[in-house]
Every structure is written in structure tokens, then in C-alpha cells.
């Protein structure tokens, strides 16, 4: 039996098991595979919204994105689909109508010889990674998923009798866990999710970039006077995927955009890599010099505050500029909507 046949045969068994009749999406299951460093974590979808499927988090780092997604959904609405995508880092298996699945997926299913029929019954795999366009799984993923699904079918079946565990109030966040040994035997227990993972992605310990500029550059910009204005600043993904020059998986480029609220003018719009702190710092001081003055305050979207602060906090503190998180950037929100419409056209 080749990998595709084995994969879709297991997928059909998962579909027929109807786990979403009993599991809520926050009833996370943990499975420790013998040759896997971290446990694999699975969320079962469908009981609440009738969108049937599974989210497979390959390790603890990916699980932190699950909690980040929950946190952001609870405390603020996602402004766009691209913003929501940045909280996804996992493999999803969703069951869709036949007419809604991509042609490539249909060809794989057809070639496997495994039959699927009915509404919301056709499997679609998607690999999610922040900054990248949702993509098809690769052959390495197929082998991994076969190993997971073989264990998930029996584990989720057995744990059905223990789901009342998730209804109890817990001092720590625990999930049902099955640990497999190389000989196929297993032990059932509970897994305490580390506090750092529960905090999500953005609240994990952040390394603030040092000032990457020369003393001459800093002296020059420090001599600028404070202006009576506030800047809005954002570094966010643009929802139009771009294929890298060397090919491969399409990416969502990041755009640094700055607006001066005093005259309602966009003063910077430049594509950047969020990890290139030196480039971002240099753009800011060039803006200050071009505007002949420093803003006493720069406001940023609260959801991206940590990411932006990691690049700019030390620089702005030295320049006596306050970096302030806010729930919404009034001027840039409108500007970004107009830009998205432009890209769509």
C-alpha cells in the first residue's frame, strides 16, 4: 500500500468515526509518538459550527499559536483574513463539498482509489505557516500524518469515555495524553501545558534589538526637536501572496507604513523583513530627519506591539519617543483598506 492510499484510507476512517459529535474544538488530545520529541496535539472541529475536520499541531511551538488564536479571538476581532492566518501554524484536514476542493486534491483522492461521497465529506489538507500562503502538504507531511492518524483513531475512540475531564475547572491547563512506546504499547495520562505556551506567541519572552545605528547617526537624529504630532506605525502582512524570485511557496510580504496624524499624510510605505531590525531602525531615523522633527509618541496596533517593540523599543526610548499600543489605528486602518482594494483590482 503506497502512502497516498494509506493516508486516505485512514482519513476515511476518521470521517466515519464522527468524533465531532462528542469532542469540542477545545478538547485537545495529546499523542506522544515514540520517535517524536514533542507531543502532537489535535483539535477536532465540527461540533460547534459544522465545519468538520482536524487541526494537527506538530509540537509545542505550534500549539502556542492555537492559544494565540483563542486569545486574539476573545479580546479583539480579527481585522482581516490575513490577520487571522498569522495565528495559524499547523496542518488542517477539512471535509468539504466535492465542488469546493482544489483540482489537485481531487486528483490525489482519485488516484488513491479511496472513495468519498456526500456533502462535507471530501478531504482537503492545508499547511499553515505565518507569513506564507496556505499550501499543500508535502511527502514528509504525508508520512507524519499517517503515523498520527493511525494512533488518533484508537486514541480518540478510547478517550470518548473520558471527555467529562474537560468540563472540570482546572488550576493548570491539562489535556488527555496517550504516550506510545516503540513496541506499540501505550500509557494514558494527563499533560500539563506549560504556562509559556498558554500565553500564546506574542507574550513569550521577547528579545529587544539593540540600537544598530552609528553614534553619528544617533547624534544627528537626537538634535531634532519634538514636533506637535503623533505618528501611526504598522508592520503587517499584505494579503496578496508573492512568489519568491527563486520560486517555492508564495509569501505574504510585510509592509512598514507610517502616517503623520497632524496632516493625515502617509510618510512611509516600504516592504521590509520584520526581523531586519537595523533596516527598520534606519528607516525611522531617516523619516525623522526628512520630517525635520521627532514625534513625542508613536502609536501601534496592540496585536503587533510586541513584534514592533522588539525592533524599535530601545531606539525610541533613547530618542525620548513613546511607543504606545492602541486597539485601532484610525488613519492607517482606512489607508490599508484602500491599498487592499487597489491590489485586488
Which residues are covered by each model-predicted region?
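Secondary-structure boundary/capping micro-motif
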Residues: 1-256, 261-345
Amino acid at each position: 500500500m503506497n502512502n497516498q492510499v494509506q493516508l486516505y484510507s485512514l482519513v476515511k476512517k476518521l470521517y466515519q468515526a464522527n468524533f465531532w459529535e462528542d469532542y469540542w474544538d477545545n478538547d485537545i488530545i495529546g499523542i506522544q509518538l515514540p520517535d517524536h520529541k514533542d507531543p502532537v496535539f489535535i483539535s477536532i472541529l465540527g461540533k460547534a459550527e459544522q465545519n468538520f475536520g482536524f487541526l494537527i499541531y506538530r509540537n509545542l511551538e505550534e500549539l502556542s499559536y492555537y492559544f494565540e488564536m483563542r486569545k486574539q479571538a476573545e479580546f479583539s476581532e480579527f481585522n482581516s483574513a490575513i490577520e487571522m492566518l498569522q495565528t495559524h501554524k499547523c496542518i488542517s484536514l477539512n471535509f468539504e463539498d466535492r465542488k469546493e476542493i482544489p483540482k489537485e486534491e481531487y486528483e490525489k483522492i482519485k488516484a488513491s482509489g479511496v472513495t468519498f461521497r456526500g456533502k462535507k465529506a471530501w478531504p482537503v489538507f492545508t499547511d499553515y505557516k505565518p507569513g506564507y500562503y496556505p499550501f499543500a502538504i508535502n511527502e514528509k507531511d504525508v508520512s507524519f500524518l499517517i503515523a498520527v492518524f493511525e494512533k488518533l483513531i484508537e486514541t480518540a475512540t478510547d478517550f470518548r469515555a473520558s471527555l467529562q475531564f474537560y468540563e472540570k475547572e482546572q488550576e493548570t491547563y491539562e489535556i488527555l495524553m496517550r504516550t506510545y512506546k516503540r513496541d506499540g504499547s501505550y500509557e494514558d495520562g494527563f499533560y500539563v501545558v506549560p504556562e509559556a505556551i498558554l500565553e500564546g506567541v506574542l507574550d513569550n519572552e521577547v528579545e529587544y534589538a539593540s540600537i544598530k545605528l552609528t553614534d553619528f547617526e544617533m547624534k544627528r537624529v537626537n538634535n531634532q526637536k519634538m514636533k506637535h504630532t503623533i505618528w501611526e506605525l504598522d508592520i503587517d502582512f499584505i494579503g496578496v501572496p508573492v512568489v519568491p524570485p527563486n520560486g517555492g511557496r508564495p509569501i505574504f510580504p510585510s509592509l512598514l507604513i507610517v502616517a503623520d496624524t497632524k496632516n493625515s499624510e502617509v510618510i512611509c510605505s516600504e516592504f521590509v523583513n520584520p526581523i531586519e531590525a537595523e533596516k527598520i531602525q534606519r528607516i525611522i531615523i531617516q523619516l525623522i530627519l526628512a520630517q525635520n522633527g521627532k514625534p513625542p509618541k508613536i502609536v501601534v496596533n496592540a496585536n503587533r506591539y510586541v513584534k514592533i517593540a522588539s525592533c524599535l523599543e530601545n531606539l525610541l526610548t533613547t530618542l525620548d519617543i513613546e511607543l504606545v499600543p492602541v486597539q485601532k489605528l484610525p488613519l492607517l486602518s482606512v489607508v490599508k483598506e484602500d491599498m487592499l482594494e487597489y491590489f485586488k483590482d
